[in-house]
């Protein structure tokens, strides 16, 4: 659910024993009760949230994952424009001895938003706490995170568009003025005061930047989009990962995996592991283009990176709706897939490669999409601009 990286964490500051009511800029109050543990050595509820126990297998997987992740900005492959912007921001913050400005990263999943937050922490030599918006269920969850941050620390919140309104309102003064607005007590005897926070950097990640409220979005000083990767960039990522995994792969083998990776490093690393398994079991080394192609065909990944679900989505639209237009909910009902999954996972890549288009009346399969599945497109699909 969350990771703490880099430096050793200092103990969280003591909180008052009183019932605390958190007040936003609009003076909306939320109750926050502190709970005393049986002993000071016992983890708090927030610490348990941030540092879950991992099994030996999970620890091994995490170690491999950490080795594959680039550790520094100059090791990060691709996203040239983003790296230039962040390099300037890092240099400026270091020269002024300030924390980085708040950063919002948006784009399809798997493009390296979490990795970039860890790199920023490494470059700034600070801690990085990672969590997701759905894990922040109550005001005390975000309060625990904020008060535990040391000077310059980075707080990474994935799926930030899913934050509740009350959590957002707590973040407003925290992001802008590095303070928590709280009200102690209830009724006429209540008193409002501000608790200072140490300067920190909030890094938010989202696949739906349009779903963020304007007050939250406007508090980010840097807003950057992550794009899909080119084949040559993914090839370099795959070759680097193969070295970490002690897997012998040729340049054309890496390129074959890259072509089928949907422009996404996370998928590239996953497919590399499947190809490695195939190579080891079949005793076929080094992994060249032919071996990689055979392995990925076995796992139902075609030369353009489409899997069974992608092809089923296109085929259903062609066979049932003559290629569209069809609404998102109609597509979900016809294929049995979740509408949000179609919109966030499958549709962006199908649109990226020109197999699907959005129109005012719904989604439409393009002529290229028809041909990829072996169908002859009707005249109306031929007229669509690709």
Swiss-Prot record:
Biased segments, Basic and acidic residues type: 56-70
The keyword DNA-binding is assigned to this record: yes
Entry's Gene Ontology BP terms: DNA recombination; DNA repair
GO cellular component term of the entry, any: Holliday junction resolvase complex
Subcellular location: Cytoplasm
Region (Head domain (RuvB-H)): 303-386
GO MF entries: ATP binding; ATP hydrolysis activity; four-way junction DNA binding; four-way junction helicase activity
Reaction catalyzed: ATP + H2O = ADP + phosphate + H(+)
The protein's name in its UniProt record: Holliday junction branch migration complex subunit RuvB
Source organism of the structure: Trichodesmium erythraeum (strain IMS101)
Gene giving rise to this polypeptide: ruvB
């Amino acid at each position: 659910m969350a990771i703490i990286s880099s430096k050793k964490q200092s103990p969280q500051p003591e909180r008052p024993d009183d019932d605390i009511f958190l007040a936003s800029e609009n003076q909306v109050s939320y109750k926050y009760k502190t709970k005393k543990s049986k002993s000071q050595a016992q983890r708090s509820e927030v610490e348990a949230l941030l540092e879950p126990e991992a099994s030996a297998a999970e620890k091994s997987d995490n170690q491999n994952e950490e080795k594959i992740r680039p550790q520094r900005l100059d090791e990060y492959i691709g996203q040239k424009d983003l790296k230039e912007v962040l390099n300037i921001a890092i240099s400026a913050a270091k020269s002024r001895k300030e924390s980085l400005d708040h950063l919002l990263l948006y784009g399809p999943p798997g493009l390296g938003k979490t990795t970039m937050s860890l790199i920023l922490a490494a470059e700034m030599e600070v801690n990085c706490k990672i969590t997701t918006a759905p894990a922040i269920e109550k005001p005390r969850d975000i309060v625990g995170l904020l008060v535990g941050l040391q000077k310059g620390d980075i707080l990474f919140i994935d799926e930030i568009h899913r934050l509740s309104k009350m959590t957002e309102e707590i973040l407003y003064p925290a992001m802008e003025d590095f303070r928590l607005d709280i009200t102690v007590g209830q009724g006429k005897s209540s008193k409002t005061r501000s608790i200072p926070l140490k300067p920190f950097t909030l890094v938010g990640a989202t696949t739906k930047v349009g779903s963020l409220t304007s007050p939250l979005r406007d508090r980010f000083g840097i807003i950057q989009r992550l794009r899909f990767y080119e084949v040559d960039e993914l090839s370099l990522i795959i070759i680097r990962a193969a070295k970490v995994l002690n897997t012998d792969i040729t340049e054309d083998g890496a390129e074959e995996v890259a072509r089928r990776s949907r422009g996404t490093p996370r998928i590239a690393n996953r497919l590399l592991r499947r190809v490695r398994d195939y190579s080891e079991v079949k005793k076929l080394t080094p992994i060249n283009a032919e071996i990689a192609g055979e392995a990925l065909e076995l796992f139902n990944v075609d030369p353009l990176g489409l899997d069974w679900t992608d092809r089923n989505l296109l085929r259903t639209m062609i066979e049932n709706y003559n290629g569209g237009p069809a609404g998102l909910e109609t597509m979900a009902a016809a294929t049995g897939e979740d509408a949000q999954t179609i919109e966030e996972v499958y549709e962006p890549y199908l649109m990226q490669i020109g197999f699907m288009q959005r129109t005012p009346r719904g989604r439409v399969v393009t002529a290229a999409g028809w041909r990829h599945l072996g169908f002859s497109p009707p005249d109306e699909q031929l007229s669509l601009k690709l």
